[in-house]
Amino acid sequence: MNGAKRRKVAQDTPRNTKPVAQEKPARAEPKPSSDEESEEESATLEEPSAEETAVDAPKKTFKDLGVNDALCEACEKLNYKYPTPIQEKSIPVALQGRDIIGLAETGSGKTAAFALPVLQALLDKPQPLFGLVLAPTRELATQIGQAFEALGSLISLRCAVIVGGLDMVPQAIALGKKPHIVVATPGRLVDHLEKTKGFSLRTLKYLIMDEADRLLDMDFGPSIDKILKFVPRERRTYLFSATISSKIESLQRASLRDPVKVSISSNKYQTVSTLLQNYLFIPHPQKDVHLIYLINEHAGQSTIVFTRTVWETQRVSILLRTLGFGAIPLHGQLSQSSRLGALNKFRSGTRDILVATDVAARGLDIPSVDVVLNYDLPQDSKTYIHRVGRTARAGKSGVAISLVTQYDLEIYLRIEAALGKKLAEYPTEKEEVMAFQSRVEEAQRIARIEMKSFTEERGKKGSTLKGGRGKKGGKRGRDDMDREEG
């Protein structure tokens, strides 16, 4: 389907009857959360209480935080008018030379929160290989590199992005030019540390781990341990994440010195007040028809559909395109160029539906997402928070709707318990939903045919879809560790 924007699917309407105008039931506006918790820790900066924020106070500027004129000018050019809460709390602490554990929801401005202090320190004492940023996915690493280049545009910053799935030779050449900042996925960075002559992190001054909880998952643990042996002990270390875990606490004890915990979220499973969350309890065989109904209801809006597997991501995207929607898949079996292409099309609005595995749920810079649809529920509450955090960002409103079948009840109840509230059911009329049934069944038939070739291609050892270069043999390498789905 080459059309850029999605169009509404015509419902099957009985002959000689006029379509009934669909009046959507009034939906309650989301209410701001009133549950505030406080932690009394000497080295913890928490978000102010409602009483404190009720007092009208002038907004702080980046200059007020201690950011120098050159970087303030870069912020102004990027339309960063005022610091976000995580920036306001972490930048002054970072400029004091402290290690930081930063806890904030996705979309809160974490990248600038750690980039600005690093760039300011670099301006004071310029040197190559000054800072290293580790990210769990290739897309997030690329995004962070772009943010550093934008913020450092007025100071001649050199930044190298080192990720798996791309040729190592150009990356080695980029490292040979002695960039100020290196942004990398763990597996590929270890490859260069072990194989690229002349590349060393002995002079490193800053180590940043973004989405730190995922970096410390089992797959990345050995690579992180190796990297820590290559970096000097005398350095500043920042860990930024949406959640904290026992693994992060272990890393804190091992590699951070007297860190300050900066948090703007008092609840581990808190979602923003502008996010309207609903569920639909449906029979499992009716997931597709209800998905199409919801997509049609939100036609023209930027939407992410989350699925659990690579196979389902591909099938659902084919189903949607067959029905005339501008959908594009994003998963770890795509080549790096295809993944970046999918993200760029979605960001630019060329495609307004992204069907994705959880590779898209964390950290990626997608400025405006109106709707999140959980076609498959995630396996845990933390992943649910990260998924729905794709929408309702930067004060905007958003909608998140989850399809819940008889097989998902246990997971769904755990999610509600973590959120501390019961979600409202999304109002539907059965007749309106089932009006799509015949067209959905035909699209399912076409999708099954197309998925045969996808399954055959995926079955080849080391294959990478859409032009990617596979490895010989089935051995799992570090590039696979930089890829979330396999």
Swiss-Prot record:
Region of interest: Disordered: 1-58, 451-486
Entry keywords, A to Z: ATP-binding, Helicase, Hydrolase, Nucleotide-binding, Nucleus, Ribosome biogenesis, RNA-binding, rRNA processing
Coiled coil: none
Keyword ATP-binding: yes
Chain ranges for the short sequence motif DEAD box as given in the UniProt record: 210-213
MF (Gene Ontology): ATP binding; ATP hydrolysis activity; RNA binding; RNA helicase activity
Domain Helicase C-terminal: 286-434
Catalytic activity: ATP + H2O = ADP + phosphate + H(+)
EC number(s) per entry: 3.6.4.13
The protein's assembly and partners: Interacts with the SSU processome.
Entry text on domains: The Q motif is unique to and characteristic of the DEAD box family of RNA helicases and controls ATP binding and hydrolysis.
Protein known as: ATP-dependent rRNA helicase RRP3
